[in-house]
Amino acid sequence: MTATSELDDSFHVFDTTLRDGAQREGINLTVADKLAIARHLDDFGVGFIEGGWPGANPRDTEFFARARQEIDFKHAQLVAFGSTRRAGANAAEDHQVKALLDSGAQVITLVAKSHDRHVELALRTTLDENLAMVADTVSHLKAQGRRVFVDCEHFFDGYRANPEYAKSVVRTASEAGADVVVLCDTNGGMLPAQIQAVVATVLADTGARLGIHAQDDTGCAVANTLAAVDAGATHVQCTANGYGERVGNANLFPVVAALELKYGKQVLPEGRLREMTRISHAIAEVVNLTPSTHQPYVGVSAFAHKAGLHASAIKVDPDLYQHIDPELVGNTMRMLVSDMAGRASIELKGKELGIDLGGDRELVGRVVERVKERELAGYTYEAADASFELLLRAEAEGRPLKYFEVESWRAITEDRPDGSHANEATVKLWAKGERIVATAEGNGPVNALDRSLRVALEKIYPELAKLDLVDYKVRILEGVHGTQSTTRVLISTSDGTGEWATVGVAENVIAASWQALEDAYTYGLLRAGVAPAE
């Protein structure tokens, strides 16, 4: 189904993640993936979702067929992508044009050549025939009741080479009935001032409704998109998280946030901007790429503060070091705990974790010194909030949080004659007055330790059954001891509803891993509401 947007038609947010974004190296979308992303984008509230090129490959053809049946679009209209008719043919008889109509999409994007050299060398036809191809295809699709957008490929490079011909393609498309003519910086080499000047000139000379499609090869795709809007473009083409071929496309999320929060344009349905961070991360999950922590607006570090001076100011007024309220885009402010942290950082971090330090300057001072001491030894709490919370609670309560007492542990790796390895770990500990000895095998010494600790504790604490180790990172810290260098391990653990990170540091990677595992299980029990042992 195709939605009817609650917004007027004066400005378009057009997403091309499913076509252009899918060209990113490392992204391989199934039909199910494309359907899932389409649902997320519709939920976000974009006006148009370009689904792919029906007829060009079976996957895109299947996507359009299934999307019509399986998705009840609330906000977006589904768009089919294709090219103008072949040179010397008739649009009404062109198989590729027919496939666009057969897709059922009520909106169609046509890619057209606007660079004279591309017409002559790639299409191998004349400049006049290229204009006829544009006019014939647009007119035919409009006669079939379709809305038509025309992407002028390589427009800005073509404009520099032959401005009159590039403008004639725009004029031809518009006069044939194209609803929007999109100027594409296909090679991504333009800068904002250049984009703004060209868009303004083309708008004045042709009177066409213009859009912008910017690639990010100079790192300017978002800026170029906004520069085009400044010059009068009313249609922006973007991809979720900036996915796209080579280095990517204009990132949907910074563009939309800038339009809504900086330009004051309502380009999404009411309230949808607050879903932006969630949608960004959900789409990253579908394409199986880790969300960029430093992505504007939606990255976990977008509103993270580390320096003590910043924290002191934020304690007085968050706006002093933040350009917007993070909640406007569904994100949160985070205080990073490091050796740069001062008292204000610790107090704010405690508040974030739900620990009221009550203005206890002595306690806060102890925590500051403890953090600096630990980071000097190689620990990092910026990425290990759970370990920091355990440290903070230990200082506040005067003793570590204990659910179990470890007597000893060991991990053994055996090399076998056939070249295989056997990994076994044994843990001896006390929990609720009971001495427990547990042994387990794993696909590595750390996995064996994790399993043996789980075996030892699950009978006492069944809450641990739902914990999963989801990420494991090892870093050899700088030093002069070679194989004796200090090792830092970061472990991420999930209980199905949330995720937390813990850290361990030791000269031995297994010992560092054990520390992080102990913290992970301790925090998991704390998170589950289990009371610690007396």
From Swiss-Prot:
Q: Which UniProt keywords apply?
A: Amino-acid biosynthesis, Branched-chain amino acid biosynthesis, Isoleucine biosynthesis, Transferase
InterPro entries given for it?
2-isopropylmalate_synth_dimer, AIPM/Hcit_synth_CS, Aldolase_TIM, Citramal_synthase, LeuA/HCS_post-cat, LeuA_allosteric_dom_sf, PYR_CT
Biological process according to GO: isoleucine biosynthetic process; L-leucine biosynthetic process
Q: What is its EC number?
A: 2.3.3.21
- Look up the record and name the pathway of this protein: Amino-acid biosynthesis; L-isoleucine biosynthesis; 2-oxobutanoate from pyruvate: step 1/3
Which reactions are catalysed by this chain?
Answer: pyruvate + acetyl-CoA + H2O = (3R)-citramalate + CoA + H(+)
Q: Does the keyword Amino-acid biosynthesis apply?
A: yes
The record's section on Gene3D superfamilies has: 1.10.238.260, 3.30.160.270, Aldolase class I
Q: Which Pfam families does the entry link to? A: HCS_D2, HMGL-like, LeuA_dimer
Query: SUPFAM superfamilies in the record, alphabetically?
Result: 2-isopropylmalate synthase LeuA, allosteric (dimerisation) domain (SSF110921), Aldolase (SSF51569)
- What GO annotations for molecular function exist for this entry? (R)-citramalate synthase activity; 2-isopropylmalate synthase activity
The residue ranges of the Pyruvate carboxyltransferase domain are 11-274
Domain of life from the UniProt record: Bacteria
Q: What does this protein do?
A: Catalyzes the condensation of pyruvate and acetyl-coenzyme A to form (R)-citramalate.
Matching NCBIfam families? citramal_synth
Which family, according to UniProt?
Belongs to the alpha-IPM synthase/homocitrate synthase family.
Q: What is this protein called?
A: (R)-citramalate synthase
What is the species listed in this Swiss-Prot or TrEMBL entry? Streptomyces coelicolor (strain ATCC BAA-471 / A3(2) / M145)
